[in-house]
Amino acid sequence: MKEDIPKDGEHKLQVPDTRPPAMFIADDPGLDFLNSIGTPAGTVIEWLANGEDLLAWLEQAKLIDSAIAAAIRANSFPGELDEVAAQARSLRERFREFVLTHMGRPLTAKALDVLEALNRVLERDEQYPAIVARPDLPRHRHARSGLELRSLRRWSTPNSLLLPLAQAMAHLVCYEDFSLVKGCEGKACVLLFLDRTHARVRRWCSMSICGNRAKQAAHRKRSPGKPESKPLKRAKRAAPINSRISP
């Protein structure tokens, strides 16, 4: 049975300079957000431990650019970004409960009743349409105009960082097939993904991580005469996070 993600403070998290890079393996930004905490090697890794982590993760996820990150950092009070990161973690775990409850089958309108917290974040958004120059990309070379209409956002406060996260989760809920949401079959892995394979046969967060471990385990079973290597210690079972966001 899989390990549950522990509550904040139940485990000593790895310090930033020893953490592996954040994992973007879900084929969906909303699920990638849920995967910003995980147990890739049996040890809890939190990639949103503080405000700087949040800015870095959003940039890596391409949900903000470096200019937005720099502007928000420059206009934040001490500790303000850390508070936003705590809200992001709370929103993440609230949405994780929803996904784990509904994954594997299509969503119905009844699910709306438990998405109120997400809607309360979305209603803070300050997006507006603007005419901007069209990027000079190959796919645009036959466009009739060098201009395009794009949705932009006013980043009024550090709390605005929650908006692209909420939008990514809302997109998953409204436009993706929840019957394709799966959890990695690795024994200690809690990562989620959207199975976009043609035959819907994806099993692992990554073949190079959990897929390879499963291959090695299968090989050991087929070779009973060979001594097995001592398995790595796994994180102890802990209760799931039950934190809530306070919009």
Enumerate the predicted regions with their spans.
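Short helix-coil boundary/hinge micro-motifs
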Residues: 1-180, 228-247
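Cys/His-enriched microdomains
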Residues: 160, 179-187, 203
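Cys/His-rich microdomains that often coordinate metals
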Residues: 188-193, 209, 214
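Cysteine-rich micro-motifs
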Residues: 200-211
